[in-house]
């Protein structure tokens, strides 16, 4: 077989979120999610850190880029919704990421702290909007935080360490009652 088949143990590789969005068919995101759920279940995996809910606010972002569905909030919501439904029906636990958003950063958080200088209104109405909608729809059993510093929300702590962000916004304002996980704590950020 091909080297891709060897690296993936024979599992099918699928397009990144931006590739799915480029098809213009959100139902394809659902079908891909169902297929991913089948593959993960066959390997004994029941929890996946996906989908990426980041808005591609900075197309030069080196770590998000094609991992984002779109630079348009409504498209991110629709494609992520279909992905979450596919995972849920396939009995795969989704952990949406990277709360409160990493699509506006300009560097890869694996190598250092990323600071996003959006104002609070922009963060709440654009970056966090997919979480707000999908939490309300009951599609997010788990959310992964990110190590981005948002001075408009918390001048001192990155999202992962911020009580203002995780408790104040995610739990209290958005009403999230599920499991919060974190991105790798050994990243450069």
What kind of feature is each model-predicted range?
Residues 17, 36, 64, 89, ...:
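Alpha-helical hydrophobic/aromatic positions enriched in membrane-embedded helices and signal peptides
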Residues 17-30, 63-74, 116-119, 154-156:
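Second-shell loop/turn segments in exported
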Residues 75-189:
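Second-shell residues forming the walls of enzyme active-site clefts
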């Amino acid at each position: 077989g091909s080297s891709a088949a060897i690296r993936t143990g024979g599992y099918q590789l699928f397009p990144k979120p931006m590739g799915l969005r480029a098809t213009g068919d959100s139902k394809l995101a659902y079908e891909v999610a169902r297929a991913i759920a089948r593959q993960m279940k066959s390997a004994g995996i029941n929890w996946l850190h996906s989908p990426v809910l980041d808005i591609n606010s900075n197309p030069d972002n080196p770590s998000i880029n094609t991992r984002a569905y779109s630079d348009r909030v409504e498209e991110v919501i629709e494609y992520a919704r279909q992905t979450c439904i596919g995972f849920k029906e396939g009995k795969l636990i989704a952990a949406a990421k990277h709360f409160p958003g990493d699509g506006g950063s300009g560097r890869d958080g694996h190598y250092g702290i990323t600071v996003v200088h959006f104002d609070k209104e922009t963060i709440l109405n654009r970056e966090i909007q997919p979480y707000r909608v999908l939490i309300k729809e009951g599609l997010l059993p788990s959310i992964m935080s990110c190590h981005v510093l948002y001075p408009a929300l918390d001048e001192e702590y990155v999202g992962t360490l911020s009580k203002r962000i995780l408790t104040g916004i995610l739990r209290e304002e958005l009403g999230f009652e599920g499991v919060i996980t974190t991105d790798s704590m050994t990243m450069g950020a």
